[in-house]
Amino acid sequence: LICLVVCALIFQGCWHHESAVERGYNEKYIGEYTRKIAFPIGGIGTGMFCIEGTGALSNMSIRHRPNVFNEPTMFAAIHVKGYEYGTRILEGPVPEWKKFGAPNSSRGDGGSWGMPRFKEYSFQSRFPFAEVELADQNVPIDVKLVAWNPFIPTDEDNSSLPVAGFEYEFHNTSNEEVQAVFSYNSMNFMQTPGRGKAYIDAAKNGFILRQTGTENEPFCQGDFMIYTDNPQTVVNHNWFRGGWFDPLSICWDNLEEGRMEENPAGLEGAVGASLYVPFTLAPGETRNIRLYMAWHVPYSQERIG
């Protein structure tokens, strides 16, 4: 019986190897090679998160310790006016291995995993840059995302800033003018329930996810800012408040309809926020939209090391 099991495992391994598309040295990652990529983003010693092979963000570890299972609900999306399936998260499909065993998965939790994504994608690493390319036959726009770290050789100070940059390149592949809305959407993942106050504050062309500390737990304090350099940016600082999955569902409804809703900042208990950048592409035209993230967590809960 043991021999049969060993033979079966060897056969399976050989079959898997033969069925896989061979990847050349330093080439793009595609297909199965993208499934467990986690490219670190963040300045030296400032905490970090990762961009995955699909373009998703995970491993959110900005509170002075690794938190590799922390995948907050935050995502970029595109809405193309006049296309039935023209609203997509700017990521490749969720890998199968992530769909089972996720925290609280018995309750149906999975963040944005059930929302439509681009079908074709690839990943390429050129540290400090990570590049994700996206395409889908239902969307007349090809997308290239370049994410980068503040890594500057011989400049350790600026290389140690708690910031990250994302540049989205949109190319109109159709023969018609395309009207679209880029958005970035995030729940307030800085919130620590029962500890201080959580709210979402205003920033120029963006928003700040905030959590205050307390006298006994100052380490709960933290800010995470998401913003663009585009003056046409519209910001919704306060998602719909409801039970279960209502806030995210209403957020997605707004995206599908191309609605750029505006709500004021500073309301305690705000669930999430979105920013929107409308744009138009002529046939064959390419346009870039830049997004930035920065964070500040001044106190640590760690007592060792």
Regions found by a protein language model. Give the residues of each.
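C-terminal motif of bacterial Sec signal peptides marking the signal peptidase cleavage site
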Residues: 12-13
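Beta-strand-rich N-terminal accessory domains
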Residues: 17-97
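Sec-dependent N-terminal signal peptides
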Residues: 1-8
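Extended, loop-rich substrate-binding clefts of extracytoplasmic carbohydrate-active enzymes
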Residues: 99-163, 240-275
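Short Pro-Gly-centered flexible turn/kink motifs
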Residues: 48, 178-180, 279-295
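Primarily extracytoplasmic ectodomains and periplasmic/lumenal surface modules that are beta-strand-rich
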Residues: 44-48, 53-59, 175-179, 189-190, ...
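Short, hydrophobic/aromatic-enriched beta-strand segments in well-ordered soluble domains
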Residues: 134, 145-147, 182-186, 287-297
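Polysaccharide-binding surfaces and accessory modules of carbohydrate-active proteins
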Residues: 150-254, 302-305
